[in-house]
């Protein structure tokens, strides 16, 4: 994709360029390490919150509910969708992939439950917010890129294309437009609604403070931690994160693949702002990196925290009924799962 002409970049684009200058000198653009220098990371996921009673069809069209159907693909009306945050520990780093959210007005609007502050959800893992060194957001939507300012020492990794996408969304002609049958004030199907003021403020706050790396495509941010672009698989600058672990390589997908069941069965999911071809290419990228679908970590899989999503079967209940799962442990790492 060609970069936009300077005259069209706008205020946000200029900030992004300034941020790149600020961080590039200090942090560079990634590096390569020898195989014996690549650690195996410990990995957990925590549930930032849970969207309750979501109609299955709009989330995954191939699973649309058909009244009276005996087909297991079409006899489920609603599902609960977790908002999963990846926690990665190893080497000199503690990394979060996505950060959940805390916009209380959206909490009410979406009918979400089991939300808890991220610092409380990290506590059972023995991690404090100030210990976190890197934040990789799969994309900049409110339920994935909130709470950034809770991590004062962490550097944010965001794609330049995502910043351009945010700028475009905020210049959308009618950002609050909604369908006739949408609830009053509801605007969740329009581009701008993915980027409410608090989220945008926190993303660009990191940039302005010199605590961000603006990524152009692929980048190895630490030994065994590799960002892969998945542009337009959900938003303009979606990105995946490859993680080296004792159970093989994992790839976190955020909403580039919201559902593990979808990537397993090759179905689109969460498609309101998605280029479906690019979503399938994101699926393919995870298959290529991991060798299959088992190690693809999805953001909103309804089967999360159960044996039906094997990656998350070692789970327990955390603050306010949220859930945590232990996915992989590095050599010498103690389990955090309560006995």
Which residues are covered by each model-predicted region?
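Bacterial N-terminal signal peptides
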Residues: 13-28
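Short glycine-enriched, charge-decorated loop/helix-capping segments at active-site entrances
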Residues: 109-112, 173, 266-272
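Metallo-beta-lactamase
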Residues: 32-127, 131-134, 161-229, 247-255, ...
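Active-site metal-binding motif and surrounding structural segment of the metallo-beta-lactamase
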Residues: 112-158
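N-terminal secretory signal peptides that target proteins for export/translocation
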Residues: 1-13
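Short, electropositive alpha-helical surface patch
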Residues: 148, 155-158, 306-328
């Amino acid at each position: 994709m060609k970069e936009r002409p300077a005259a069209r970049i706008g205020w946000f684009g200029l900030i992004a360029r300034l941020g790149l200058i600020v961080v590039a000198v200090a942090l560079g653009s990634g590096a390569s390490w020898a195989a014996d220098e690549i650690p195996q990371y410990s990995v957990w996921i925590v549930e930032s919150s849970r969207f309750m009673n979501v109609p299955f069809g709009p989330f995954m069209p191939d699973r649309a509910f058909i009244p009276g159907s005996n087909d297991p693909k079409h006899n489920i009306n609603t599902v609960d969708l977790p908002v999963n945050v990846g926690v990665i520990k190893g080497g000199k780093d503690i990394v979060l992939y996505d950060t959940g959210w805390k916009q209380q007005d959206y909490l009410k609007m979406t009918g979400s439950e089991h939300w808890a502050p991220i610092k409380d959800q990290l506590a059972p893992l023995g991690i404090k917010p100030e210990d976190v060194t890197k934040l990789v957001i799969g994309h900049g939507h409110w339920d994935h890129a909130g709470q950034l300012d809770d991590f004062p020492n962490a550097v944010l990794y965001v794609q330049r294309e995502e910043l351009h996408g945010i700028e475009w969304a905020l210049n959308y002609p009618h950002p609050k437009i909604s369908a006739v049958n949408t609830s009053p004030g509801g605007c969740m199907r329009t581009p701008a609604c993915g980027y409410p003021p608090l989220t945008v403020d926190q993303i660009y706050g990191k940039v302005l403070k010199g605590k961000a790396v603006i990524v152009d495509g692929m980048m190895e941010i630490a030994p065994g931690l590799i960002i892969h672009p998945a542009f337009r698989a959900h938003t303009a600058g979606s990105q995946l994160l490859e993680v080296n672990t004792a159970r093989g390589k994992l790839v976190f997908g955020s909403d580039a693949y919201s559902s593990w069941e979808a990537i397993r069965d090759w179905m689109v999911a969460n498609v309101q702002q998605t280029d479906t071809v690019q979503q399938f290419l994101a699926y393919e990228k995870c298959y290529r990196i991991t060798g299959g679908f088992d190690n693809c970590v999805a953001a909103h899989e309804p089967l999360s925290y159960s044996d039906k999503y094997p990656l998350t079967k070692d789970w327990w209940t955390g603050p306010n009924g949220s859930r945590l799962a232990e996915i992989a442990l590095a050599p010498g790492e103690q389990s955090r799962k309560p006995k």
